[in-house]
Amino acid sequence: YNPNVTIDDGSCLYYGCTDPAADNYDPNASVDDGSCTYSGCTVAPFLETFDAFGNLGPFTDDFGAGGSQGATVAWTQDASGTSSGSTGPSDDITGGGYYMYTETSGSGSNKTAILFSTCVDVSALSDPCMQFNYHMYGATMGTLEVHVDGVSVWSVSGDQGNQWNDGQVNLPIGSTGCLIQFVGLTGTSFTSDMAIDQVSVDECVSLAVYGCTDSTAINYDPAADTDDGS
């Protein structure tokens, strides 16, 4: 505010919540002050194992919910291996539990599967990250992406071997309502069943770097901190 001004030039700044999806959205605010609040958000830290059949925790399969976010095939809760050989996991990462996967037999190839979260409140975390395990085994494997607030922040394509791998993405510091999507872009045939498991939102951690840690070996990897037997 300038008391000497007689004509408003439109430069006034009004602080408040500028997100229309928030409970306390202020249509008069021009600068977001980080005060937005959202009802029904999942508060971090949390861990979703998918082990309670029929219960996906804070996540929803978009295809099963009508496909409003663009899904053309489902993420399916499963245990003990997928129906096709030479693709997909044989078990969940801990053994004996459930995971989420995309079935690409029949009409499931060249499709998009979307698993989306409720809003996630990470404001209690100083360095928020989402950690998860993924399995991408198959000769015609497609692409797995993670989107945060509509932006792709992580992507892996192609056959990653017949094992569970570790993934981690940073989440926006201070956010009281970020949105997460796992987007599976299936491959060209039935050997592209991808899966995810053990999704957690917590403080960031240092992930293991697998490779040959023997400095006398010809394939020694100085960046590796965990030997993978190669």
Name each model-derived stretch.
Residues 108-113, 186-204:
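Extracellular carbohydrate recognition
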Residues 122-126, 135-143, 188-190:
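Extended, low-complexity, turn-rich repeat/linker tracts enriched in Gly/Pro/Ser/Thr and Asp/Glu
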Residues 1-42, 206-230:
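Extracellular calcium-associated, cysteine-rich motifs in secreted modular proteins
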Residues 106-129, 165-167:
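Short beta-strands within extracellular/lumenal beta-sheet-rich domains
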Residues 45-46, 52-106:
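Extracellular glycan-recognition surfaces and repeat-rich motifs
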Residues 143-149:
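Short, surface-exposed beta-strand/strand-loop-strand elements in extracellular ectodomains
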